[in-house]
Amino acid sequence: MASNTLIESTSVRRSPAEHLAEAMAQGSTAGTVQLREIAFATQVGVRAVPGSGGFAALAEAVGTGLPQQVGVVAGSVEGTAVLWLGPDEFLAIAPEGAELAAELVAALGDEPGQVLDLSANRSVLELSGPAAPLVLRKSCPADLHPRAFGVNLAITTTLANIPVLLWRTGEQSWYILPRASFTEHTVHWLIDAMSEFASEPVA
């Protein structure tokens, strides 16, 4: 008799850059520039009009408030953070396993707004180290100077000719969020751009 076996989804899931982990490690240089994937981060799309009941409910439920200025990130990379994408559009990011989408749906109730689990929509890559801005500047048109792009700011820009979300999470660390389908292209470009920092400069 045939039998059915249920397999835990977590045992078979694969992150967009899982197969590139070794290449990212080999392309990284300790103390200079490093690249890794933040796998399976919880990502929730939120839409609500500022001033509405839905906005107030979601702002309270997410625990960080919802940012109301271009580029502002509410919260921090250590916990839940909310990135401003537009006047009524936001992306909440939380650690793997967070039940954020369900919590926000419950909080929204019948108020106007939208909550959507987007965890599979984008990959999350972390580029860190003192040379990280030099790598990004090779293809990113945004002004990355600290006076213009401070810690905990995030923007929509391009990198390697594809659209990405770029979030400065620390003085020397950045989150890069390309669409999942562009992850491999982005990683290979970053590894190539990092290659000049792999060896000590010739005196």
Curated annotation (Swiss-Prot):
Lineage of producing organism: Bacteria, Bacillati, Actinomycetota, Actinomycetes, Mycobacteriales
Protein's job: In the presence of tetrahydrofolate, catalyzes the oxidative demethylation of sarcosine to yield glycine, 5,10-methylenetetrahydrofolate and hydrogen peroxide. In the absence of tetrahydrofolate, catalyzes the oxidative demethylation of sarcosine to yield glycine, formaldehyde and hydrogen peroxide.
Record's subcellular location: Cytoplasm
Note: Utilization of tetrahydrofolate is probably the physiological reaction since the products are substrates for serine hydroxymethyltransferase, an enzyme which is part of the sarcosine oxidase operon.
Record note on quaternary structure: Heterotetramer composed of subunits alpha (SoxA), beta (SoxB), gamma (SoxG) and delta (SoxD).
Organism of derivation: Corynebacterium sp. (strain P-1)
A Pfam family it matches: SoxG
Alphabetical list of NCBIfam families matching this protein: soxG (TIGR01375)
Gene Ontology molecular function, alphabetical: sarcosine oxidase activity
GO BP field: sarcosine catabolic process
EC number(s) recorded for this UniProt protein: 1.5.3.24
Family of this protein: Belongs to the SoxG family.
Reaction equations catalysed: sarcosine + (6S)-5,6,7,8-tetrahydrofolate + O2 = (6R)-5,10-methylene-5,6,7,8-tetrahydrofolate + glycine + H2O2; sarcosine + O2 + H2O = formaldehyde + glycine + H2O2
First-listed, main subcellular location of the protein, grouped into a coarse class: cytoplasm
Protein name as catalogued: Sarcosine oxidase subunit gamma
InterPro entries: SoxG, SoxG_het, TrmE/GcvT_dom1
Keyword annotations of the record: Cytoplasm, Oxidoreductase
GO cellular component: cytoplasm
